[in-house]
Amino acid sequence: GRYSEIPREMLESGDFVTPHLNYVAYFEKPVLHYWLTALSFEVLGQNEFAARFFPAVLAMAGVFVVYWLADRMYGPRAAFLSAWILATSLVYFAIGQINITDMPLSFFMTLSSAGFWMGYRRDRRYFVLFYLGMALGLLTKGLVGVVLPAGVAFWWIVLTRKWEVVREALYLPGLALFFLVGTPWFVLVCMKNPDFFDFFFIQEHFLRYTTKMHGRFEPWWWFIPIIIVGSIPWTGFLPGAIASALPSSIASRTRQDRGKIFLLLWFGIIFLFFSISNSKLIPYIVPVMPPLAILMGSFLDLNMDRGKTRSLGM
């Protein structure tokens, strides 16, 4: 596929700024995924294993980030359950073996959201991960890698009224890292290719999202059955996990409820964003799986303590 051919042509030509597909400039996606695959080809050879290597590695890395975050939010048992649920969920497991940009994007968005939460709860320096994840997401799939993590953080601050987090999150080293990592390639590719800006930001962002130009239109509810099937074998726990997070989150502002609000927003904003879009593909929904896994893992952990695991099917 093109995600293997473009890196191969990069290695052949030595041009690591302008992606080419069949020796024609190709601007549908940013460059990071091509760079990672080219590195894999250079080290492991140009073969199928090398092409799939980095998506698989980043899928596993996403599992570890979910464990880390869930451990800090709910404890080690919930962390283990969350990580196990994520690693074995059908859609996450499947997409992690395919050489496309969606799993890398999911990992960088997960890293960003985890960095935001840890920056708020533990140490301001973790906000560096918030900005680094957005920068790498930007280089992987464009503005979606910034808009969604930033949107989750923004709406969480609004709903919880934690206005002081705005000042804390505007962390100068993190902001500097974002621009240092995320912007140089865009400057270089625009200098070499004056038509890049219009094609990439107007056609591939605004028009792809708001029109049916790519012929990938589906109804707004299309991702609901994808999530249901994609959560197999854990689908049965989804309704309870989401329902148990809703009432207390709305009713109070305790530390635990702020965590539930954060996870629900993380899931809900990504889900709504892609559901509204006029361009839909199954892999787009992968980034909702990490917050869903933590919701389900913490739900199971809580019900184990209450002795309800038998009624939950365990």
Identify the function of each model-found stretch:
Residues 1-310:
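Membrane-integral, polyisoprenol-dependent glycosyltransferases
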